């Protein structure tokens, strides 16, 4: 079974957690695009969605789903998003699509974070296969990069990418993240960092994995 089929399988399985008349938090990325597509099939049963990126907002509107601002809601039942890596503790690296800050904002509004992935995203240690994205205020880029080198990382500027918030991304290689919660806190305390792509303080509650054998749900 190919990767896209596994993503679609996980996205379809996430529909069982969508409650009637609710507003859904929606992340961004290729697996979430599959979820938005299937969410369109039940759009008459929900009030709408809060999107974590402009790209997801456009896809939701194209499906005929009303999009609300995060400022319009006091909370969400669920937030559905993918991950670039996820460990057995349901902690993640996210930000391959440069939407990490808004993803953290919308995830923080939700009672339940449902992570949908294909099996290739499962790792034992975060940072094993994917660089850690960090959103940085442009004027602090070099300063933050030096700090990341001092912490043992190898940062690379993601060229020609500007986030929805007008900032830049540094992708940090060679970080084996043994203590994700402490690393998330430490990196967020670096002056000039908006946020980093470790989702450990707010990890997933439910993980839906598309595998060649079928859908696996980890609660």
Swiss-Prot record:
- An example Gene Ontology cellular component term from the record? cytosol
Summarize where substrate binds, as residue positions.
28-31, 81-84, 94-97, 121
- A Pfam match is Rib_5-P_isom_A
Molecular function terms in GO for this entry? ribose-5-phosphate isomerase activity
Kindly state which reaction or reactions the protein catalyses. Answer: aldehydo-D-ribose 5-phosphate = D-ribulose 5-phosphate
Known EC number: 5.3.1.6
Q: In which pathway does it act?
A: Carbohydrate degradation; pentose phosphate pathway; D-ribose 5-phosphate from D-ribulose 5-phosphate (non-oxidative stage): step 1/1
GO aspect biological process, one term: D-ribose metabolic process
**Top-level taxon of origin:** Bacteria
> Matching SUPFAM superfamilies, A to Z?
D-ribose-5-phosphate isomerase (RpiA), lid domain, NagB/RpiA/CoA transferase-like
Q: Where is the active site?
A: 103 (proton acceptor)
Q: Keywords assigned by UniProt? A: Isomerase
Similarity field: Belongs to the ribose 5-phosphate isomerase family.
Q: What does this protein do?
A: Catalyzes the reversible conversion of ribose-5-phosphate to ribulose 5-phosphate.
Q: How does it assemble?
A: Homodimer.
What is the protein's given name? Ribose-5-phosphate isomerase A
- Its source organism is Histophilus somni (strain 129Pt) (Haemophilus somnus)
Organism lineage? Bacteria, Pseudomonadati, Pseudomonadota, Gammaproteobacteria, Pasteurellales
